[in-house]
Amino acid sequence: MKTCIITYTNEKFVSKIQTMISEIREIGKYDGDIVVIIGEDLKDRLQYEDDDRVIIKYFPEIDREENIAKLKEKPITEGWGNPEFNKTFMWHKLYAFHPFFKQWDKCFAMDGGMKIFKPLEKILNLDCKNSILAHYDGYPNNTDWKLRRQFDDTQFPEIFAELEGEFDLDVDYFQATMFIYDTSLLRDDTFDTIIELSKKYFTSKLTDQGIVNLYFNNKKYYNVWEQIQIKDDETYYYDYTERDGLNYTEYIMLKRAHTCPHWSF
């Protein structure tokens, strides 16, 4: 089975990506393909000459000027740092579902800056046939969190009303910080449909996360999200951060490793 790891970076986070790739190779013991998705700011500039299995893949910026102007006029996430217009590169993460990736059977996507503490083999070997594996965002203590909280319902009530009429928003939802999916799920129109959703429902508070759930975690398109394995007898697999007094050494990988002395955001 052909597998690739996908990650993303703009110019600001290049050094974090380089560190993460080193950890994937040296600690994660993964020697397969790694695709780094980039945009305009790194086009024809970022190279990885020391590793011929690191593929730098440029994708063009998607025009969001009209949506961004509306969001600047009526911000939707002031308590969260306004990623809707301050972190617009996050929309580039949607390219993880581009037809380009059909050349692999399984794709393991992760945010730049992820910390790797153990070999990735156990995660890479998880069975994702006909599914997307990812971690529930409300784990473990916020089991009342449903998909509706990922979308603004105040500043743009008319958009929320349309969204609520089209999708079931009272479902659990997954983090888009990391996921593994079977590329047979990629239809000819998958990427275009996801982009259309992202423009129509631009009031997704954490940009890509809500949109990916609309497509892969709802009856209208696909209802194929499965909770990724949390742990086995030897280790925890992945979480956003350490939980319940656990130490980073008890995980394969973390997004934010607060107990790790070498971690910085």
Language-model region placement:
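Glycosyltransferase catalytic domains, chiefly GT-A lineage
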Residues: 1-265
